[in-house]
Every structure is written in structure tokens, then in C-alpha cells.
């Protein structure tokens, strides 16, 4: 892997080459979209630094970088709901990663839901945005799992 601090490779090499050369942002992160390998549903969007990306590739389990906690974390380290990576892809610019996972425990979201995307943006009668719960059934009680 190549860090963003290294010399910039040619655009053609980034878009068409076979070398992994992730383009980390100023904070040293790439966006990661995680989907359920079976259903194709989006489970979550998170971030990876170089270490999280490397650990994910090497271990076959999803690792992320928490911007709020400012630390590396393995998905499922507290809940047991690990994500086994079945496929990883990187986009054309190599600045975003997509991983397809087998989600243990049936829930990816820290709220106990299958997906972090459990609210749809609709409009009320006056045209104002309104959030509607969809696919919002909890798979686990976050208070019991995380002790909040």
C-alpha cells in the first residue's frame, strides 16, 4: 500500500492499474461503504485509515477508524457482531472502499438495528423534510450490549 504522502502516481495507474494505492484525505482516511453480501443492503458508512485498511485485508474482518473516539476499532469488538469480509473493492479514484460482508448477529448499527440507514427522508403535508422509520426493528438492546 502507498500512503498519500508518497509521490503521486499517474492518473492512468490509479484508474486502470492493479496496484492498491489508496488516496487518503487530509485526516488520513478513506470512506468505506459496507453492504450485506447476501441482500446487497447498505449496512453502514464508516472510515478507514491505513492501519484499518491493512488489518481488514490481512484478517478478513472489518476494521474501521472512529473519528469521534480517534482510534482504531474492530467491528463487533464490543457487541460480538463482527463483519466477515467476503469482497473488497476500491473506487476509480482509490479514495473510497466498498466491502461486502457477512454480518454476524444480524445487526451492524450501534443502535441495535440491521443497518444504520433505518430512516427514510420523506416530506410532510407542507413539504418539510420528515423522517420515517423503515426497517427499524432492533436486533439487540444496545443498553445491554454496551452498558449505557
From Swiss-Prot:
<keyword id="KW-0028">Amino-acid biosynthesis</keyword>
<feature type="binding site">
    <location>
        <position position="95"/>
    </location>
    <ligand>
        <name>Mg(2+)</name>
    </ligand>
</feature>
<keyword id="KW-0378">Hydrolase</keyword>
<keyword id="KW-0963">Cytoplasm</keyword>
<comment type="subunit">
    <text>Homodimer.</text>
</comment>
<feature type="binding site">
    <location>
        <position position="116"/>
    </location>
    <ligand>
        <name>Zn(2+)</name>
    </ligand>
</feature>
<dbReference type="InterPro" id="IPR038019">
    <property type="entry name" value="PRib_AMP_CycHydrolase_sf"/>
</dbReference>
<dbReference type="GO" id="GO:0000287">
    <property type="term" value="F:magnesium ion binding"/>
</dbReference>
<dbReference type="Pfam" id="PF01502">
    <property type="entry name" value="PRA-CH"/>
</dbReference>
<dbReference type="InterPro" id="IPR002496">
    <property type="entry name" value="PRib_AMP_CycHydrolase_dom"/>
</dbReference>
<protein>
    <recommendedName>
        <fullName>Phosphoribosyl-AMP cyclohydrolase</fullName>
        <ecNumber>3.5.4.19</ecNumber>
    </recommendedName>
</protein>
<comment type="function">
    <text>Catalyzes the hydrolysis of the adenine ring of phosphoribosyl-AMP.</text>
</comment>
<keyword id="KW-0479">Metal-binding</keyword>
<dbReference type="InterPro" id="IPR026660">
    <property type="entry name" value="PRA-CH"/>
</dbReference>
<feature type="binding site">
    <location>
        <position position="109"/>
    </location>
    <ligand>
        <name>Zn(2+)</name>
    </ligand>
</feature>
<dbReference type="GO" id="GO:0004635">
    <property type="term" value="F:phosphoribosyl-AMP cyclohydrolase activity"/>
</dbReference>
<feature type="binding site">
    <location>
        <position position="92"/>
    </location>
    <ligand>
        <name>Zn(2+)</name>
    </ligand>
</feature>
<dbReference type="GO" id="GO:0008270">
    <property type="term" value="F:zinc ion binding"/>
</dbReference>
<feature type="binding site">
    <location>
        <position position="93"/>
    </location>
    <ligand>
        <name>Mg(2+)</name>
    </ligand>
</feature>
<keyword id="KW-0368">Histidine biosynthesis</keyword>
<dbReference type="GO" id="GO:0005737">
    <property type="term" value="C:cytoplasm"/>
</dbReference>
<comment type="similarity">
    <text>Belongs to the PRA-CH family.</text>
</comment>
<keyword id="KW-0862">Zinc</keyword>
<keyword id="KW-0460">Magnesium</keyword>
<feature type="binding site">
    <location>
        <position position="91"/>
    </location>
    <ligand>
        <name>Mg(2+)</name>
    </ligand>
</feature>
<dbReference type="GO" id="GO:0000105">
    <property type="term" value="P:L-histidine biosynthetic process"/>
</dbReference>
<comment type="pathway">
    <text>Amino-acid biosynthesis; L-histidine biosynthesis; L-histidine from 5-phospho-alpha-D-ribose 1-diphosphate: step 3/9.</text>
</comment>
